Every structure is written in structure tokens, then in C-alpha cells.
A protein has these predicted regions:
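His/Met- and acidic-residue-enriched segments that coordinate or traffic transition-metal cofactors
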Residues: 1-159
Length: 159
């Protein structure tokens, strides 16, 4: 899930990765939402985008306040950024293939159900590692919101 270069990953590494992942997913939704055919799916996607935006804010605040990061989106381990860029490219390629095959709604709902689950898992990992009460509280709420969004995507996909 996170790049390893022989060094033990720190709590900050996971927060960096979660921030970059949430920000990237938000950008992908912005790009593909207008291409979705289903108004229900567009609504679900915009709701998820809002949750991801709040999530990014929480993680960015934690990076600067709790970890003293000079800038967000600039992880200490460059391999994290490289891995997330590769992950973003793979997601974009999958969605574009779905669009070209006339299956974007189906591919989008499947991929974002999966991507949301991956982000939840990453944030749960942070939650078990952190001793920062403020971050714990905010992540607990964020995870709950992500789970609700994932459940809506899952319900759409099951139709």
C-alpha cells in the first residue's frame, strides 16, 4: 500500500500518502463527473468529492500542525509521491478505457468503491498508529463519512 525503501514507514509517511491519495481522487472526480450518464451517480460522486475535500483539509492541517511539514503534498519519502502518481495514472487509464467502451458509469462506481475502501484502510492504519487525539477524532469522523460514501457507491453498483 505504501512504498517501502528498506526504511520503516513513519506515521507521517502514512498521513502524506493519505493526503495525496485523497487529493488525487478528488481531482479524478472533478474530471470524470461531467462525463457520467447517471444523475444519481453524479450526485454520489459529488458527495464523495465533498468528503474527500474535507478529508484532504484534515490531513493537510495535521501535516503542518502535528508533523511540522513545510508544505503538503511534498512527502519526506519521494517514493510515496512516485507511487501515488503511478496509482493515479492507472486509475485514469482504467476510467478512460471505461469511457471509450461506453461503460464509464459501471467502471467509475466499481473503481471508486475500491478506491474509497483503500483510503479507509489507509486512514484506519493511521488511526491505530497515532497518539494525536485531535487527529484520531477527526479521522474517526472522516472514516465514517468515507464508509457512507462507499456504501452509496456500492448500492449504486448493485442495481
Amino acid at each position: 500500500m505504501i512504498a517501502t525503501s528498506g526504511n520503516k514507514n513513519s506515521e507521517r509517511d502514512y498521513v502524506d500518502q493519505a493526503y495525496i491519495r485523497a487529493s488525487n481522487l478528488e481531482k479524478v472526480i472533478s474530471e470524470y463527473n461531467k462525463k457520467l450518464k447517471s444523475s444519481d451517480l453524479r450526485s454520489i460522486a459529488m458527495s464523495l468529492k465533498s468528503v474527500l475535500s474535507e478529508n484532504s483539509f484534515i490531513l493537510a492541517t495535521s501535516l503542518t500542525e502535528d508533523f511540522g511539514a513545510k508544505g503538503v503534498g511534498e512527502p519526506e519519502k519521494k517514493s510515496i509521491l512516485e507511487d501515488e502518481e503511478a496509482h493515479l495514472t492507472e486509475l485514469d487509464d482504467t476510467l478512460e478505457a471505461g469511457r471509450l467502451n461506453g461503460l464509464l458509469d459501471r467502471v467509475f462506481s466499481r473503481e471508486f468503491t475500491y478506491q474509497t475502501s483503500m483510503l479507509i484502510s489507509l486512514e484506519e492504519n493511521i488511526l491505530t498508529r497515532t497518539k494525536k487525539d485531535n487527529l484520531k477524532s477527526k479521522l474517526t469522523t472522516s472514516i465514517s463519512n468515507l464508509e457512507q460514501a462507499r456504501d452509496r457507491l456500492d448500492a449504486f453498483e448493485a442495481r
